[in-house]
Curated annotation (Swiss-Prot):
This is Tyrosine-protein phosphatase non-receptor type 2. Residues 5-275 form the Tyrosine-protein phosphatase domain. Belongs to the protein-tyrosine phosphatase family. Non-receptor class 1 subfamily. It comes from the Eukaryota. GO terms for biological process: B cell differentiation; erythrocyte differentiation; glucose homeostasis; insulin receptor recycling; insulin receptor signaling pathway; negative regulation of cell population proliferation; negative regulation of chemotaxis; negative regulation of epidermal growth factor receptor signaling pathway. It comes from Rattus norvegicus (Rat). GO terms for molecular function: DNA binding; integrin binding; non-membrane spanning protein tyrosine phosphatase activity; protein kinase binding; protein tyrosine phosphatase activity; receptor tyrosine kinase binding; STAT family protein binding; syntaxin binding. It catalyses: O-phospho-L-tyrosyl-[protein] + H2O = L-tyrosyl-[protein] + phosphate. The active site is at C216. Keywords: Cell membrane, Cytoplasm, Endoplasmic reticulum, Hydrolase, Membrane, Nucleus, Phosphoprotein, Protein phosphatase, S-nitrosylation. The modification Phosphoserine is found at S52, S293, S298, S304, S320, S339. Does not show tissue- or cell-type specificity although levels of transcription show variability. Macrophages showed higher levels of expression than lymphocytes. Interacts with RMDN3. Interacts with TMED9. Interacts with STX17; dephosphorylates STX17. Interacts with ITGA1 (via cytoplasmic domain); activates the phosphatase activity towards EGFR. Interacts with TRAF2; probably involved in tumor necrosis factor-mediated signaling. Interacts with MET. Interacts with FAM220A and STAT3; interaction with FAM220A promotes interaction of PTPN2 with transcriptional activator STAT3, leading to dephosphorylation of STAT3 by PTPN2 and negative regulation of STAT3 transcriptional activator activity. The keyword DNA repair does not apply.
């Protein structure tokens, strides 16, 4: 099975057909209604205007006045895998995010982006980074940090999610891949697979509990890559026929735009081919992935890491160690990436608009609070003024009565 995919990979590489294959997938993908995402009251719950959940597969918040969240349930029955793919939470949707995690009985959150990338906000800080808990009063949840395990390119947090109303608590694993660039790919299949199997070992992807929540910034590019590779490897482990293109098209029926670039598609093939070695019974492969990923090194500077990974995958710096492991060149054939670049520029504009909108919303909230305080003062001012006037009269009367008492009553008592 992996040999077939490897031959397909080599042919696509030799013929420089990654761009045409990506366009084929995009053109063959079905477009389903996504009306709820466009409702006026839901506009501020979407990070990007062009990334919306389909109506038939969107996750619905239960017991909420508005059940909308930009999240999709991707259900691959033959692999017994279910994922919730969602956008990076906004400041005003963090509370909805944790409500969804609770209601869906999720055991793990897989985060594939950083909160800020290339000076653009990609995701709100929805989990605590120190001992102070985060409280989300709107939906009645609090989150505490229990532990943190920092590796060179990913971090694992253990979080305690508490339902404030019932007092019930759950432990949530938070797997954070910290060096995967937007519209890009991980440094190598080995490092990615080491991370994927770390998530797998936690049992969080198993079907005996709620679906794992997978997110990046938009919830389609990096999230789609992660889900596609995991699904294909599960099917290979089950001995099923694996057609990567058809599986991706099937997954795109649940959430639009999964995998955003030809590079991400190519990397998915590389990771599937490399991951298939584990399904063949190579007991030492995971150990080699861990060694090649160099996860135990100290985390590097984010900016230099981001640049290194981009150069490496564009063929300017080739990882020789990884090539020895996979037998596949990490150099990508030159392709016309105009559509991807235009999407990236559009995404940057959307990020700026979203950041501006958030600042405007915060300013409006401050102005509204100031206006409420002013109205309260205007309401109470005449009452307090009258009360003050009455108090002055009462005090004056009391003082006058006291003086009158001293002048008239006390002399009589003295004479007596």
């Amino acid at each position: 099975m992996s040999a077939t995919i490897e031959r397909e990979f080599e042919e696509l590489d030799a013929q420089c057909r990654w761009q045409p294959l990506y366009l084929e997938i995009r053109n063959e993908s079905h477009d389903y209604p996504h009306r709820v995402a466009k409702f006026p009251e839901n506009r501020n719950r979407n990070r990007y205007r062009d990334v919306s959940p389909y109506d038939h597969s969107r996750v619905k918040l239960q017991s909420a006045e508005n059940d909308y969240i930009n999240a999709s349930l991707v259900d691959i029955e033959e692999a017994q895998r279910s994922y919730i793919l969602t956008q990076g939470p906004l400041p005003n949707t963090c509370c909805h995010f944790w409500l969804m995690v609770w209601q869906q009985k999720t055991r793990a959150v897989v985060m594939l982006n950083r909160t800020v990338e290339k000076e653009s906000v990609k995701c709100a800080q929805y989990w605590p980074t120190d001992d102070r808990e985060m409280v989300f009063k709107e939906t009645g949840f609090s989150v505490k940090l229990l532990s943190e395990d920092v590796k060179s390119y990913y971090t694992v947090h253990l979080l305690q999610l508490e339902n404030i109303n019932s007092g019930e608590t759950r432990t949530i694993s938070h797997f954070h891949y910290t060096t995967w660039p937007d519209f890009g790919v991980p440094e190598s299949p080995a490092s990615f697979l080491n991370f994927l199997f770390k998530v797998r070992e936690s049992g969080s992807l198993n079907p005996d509990h709620g679906p794992a929540v997978i997110h990046c910034s938009a919830g389609i590019g990096r999230s789609g890559t992660f889900s596609l590779v995991d699904t294909c490897l599960v099917l290979m482990e089950k001995g099923e026929d694996v057609n990567v293109k058809q599986i991706l098209l099937s997954m795109r029926k649940y959430r639009m735009g999964l995998i955003q670039t030809p590079d991400q598609l190519r990397f998915s093939y590389m990771a599937i081919i490399e991951g298939a070695k584990y399904t063949k019974g190579d007991s030492n492969i995971q150990k080699r992935w861990k060694e090649l990923s160099k996860e135990d090194l100290s985390p590097v500077c984010r900016h230099s890491q981001n640049r290194t990974m981009t150069e490496k995958y564009n063929g300017k710096r080739i990882g020789s160690e990884d090539e020895k492991l996979t037998g596949l060149s990490s150099k990508v054939p030159d392709t016309v990436e105009e559509s991807s670049e235009s999407i990236l520029r559009k995404r940057i504009r959307e990020d700026r608009k979203a950041t501006t909108a958030q600042k405007v919303q915060q300013m409006r909230q401050r102005l509204n609070e100031t206006e409420r305080k002013r109205k309260r003062w205007l309401y109470w001012q005449p009452i307090l003024t009258k009360m003050g006037f009455v108090s002055v009269i009462l005090v004056g009367a009391l003082v006058g009565w006291t003086l009158l008492f001293q002048l008239n009553v006390l002399p009589r008592l003295t004479d007596t």
